[in-house]
Amino acid sequence: MRSPVVRRTALAASAAALALFATACGGSSDEGDKGADGRTAQADKSASAAPATTKPLSAAELEKAALAQTDVKSGKVVTKLPATDDIAQDKVKTDKAACAPLGLLQVGSYAGKPAASVKRSWTGDAKKPEAGASAEDSMIAALDRAKVVLTLASYADGGAEQAMKDLTKAAADCAGGFSFTADGETTKVAKVAVTAAPQGADEALALTSTVDAEGDKFPAKSVVVRKGATLAYFPAVNMASAASGKDWAFPTEIVDAQLAKLK
C-alpha cells in the first residue's frame, strides 16, 4: 500500500497545473548543466498605470533579453522547450470566464495578445537528503526544488498594462477558486491569494494558488512583472510541496536576474 506522501506525489504529478515540471526538465540549456503574505502597492498600481509608449520588443530582441545560464548563480536554464509543453491559449479553458488569465498563467502561457514572445525555463539545483534519511524523506529532498517557466511577452498599444489589469482583476474575482482544463486535464484551484511581489519593475503581481488534487492541497506560485511594454511571467511549482502540502519560497533571484536584462 502506498504511503500518503507517495500518493500525494502521484496525484500532484498528474495535475495539469504541474505540466511545468515536464517543461522545466526538458530541452537544452544555454551552456549545459552548470553547476509574508500581504498585498503589495505594485500590484495595486495596475489599475491606474498610464499606457507605455515604448515600442514593443521584437522576437529577436526578446531572445536577447531573455534569461540565460550565465545570468543565474544556480539551477539550470533551458532555452529550447518542447512544442508539446508550449500550450496555446485556445487549448486552455476555465470554468469561469473571469479566471481565464489565471488559467493561462498557471499553464505557462500569457494574457492578452502580445506582439512577440519567447520562453525559457529554470530548475533549481537538487538538494541532498540528510544522512540516515528514510526513503520517503530522501525522495522529498530530491524533489525540493522550484521549477519555473518564464515567458517574456511584448505588447503594443498599452497591451502590457491591460494584461496586468486583467490579471490583477482575475486574482480578486477568483480568490475563492476556479478550475481550468488544458490538454484534456482538469485542475481545481481552491483559492488564490495575492502576496508580496518583488521590487524593481514598473508593476508586479505575486500570487499563491492552492491547487486541489483530489482533496490533497498544495501551493503553486506565480509572479508577473511589467517593464515598459514587456511582461515577464513566472509560474512556478515545487514537487516536494505538492507531496507534503507545505509552503515553499519562490525563487525571487530569477525575477531579479530577468529584470536586470529588461531595460
For each of these PLM feature ranges, what is it?
Residues 1-23:
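Sec-dependent bacterial lipoprotein signal peptides
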Residues 8-9, 222, 259:
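Hydrophobic alpha-helical segments, especially transmembrane helices
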Residues 10-11, 21-67, 94-99, 105-140:
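N-terminal low-complexity, Pro/Thr-rich disordered segments
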Residues 50-84, 88-89, 209, 245-253:
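Extracytoplasmic/periplasmic mature domains of Sec-exported, cell-envelope-associated bacterial proteins
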Residues 78-218:
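A small/polar (G/S/T-enriched), proline-flanked helix-loop surface module common
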Residues 190-252:
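A short, solvent-exposed beta-edge/loop patch
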Residues 251-262:
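Short, low-complexity, Pro/Ser/Thr/Gly-rich segments in the mature regions of secreted, periplasmic
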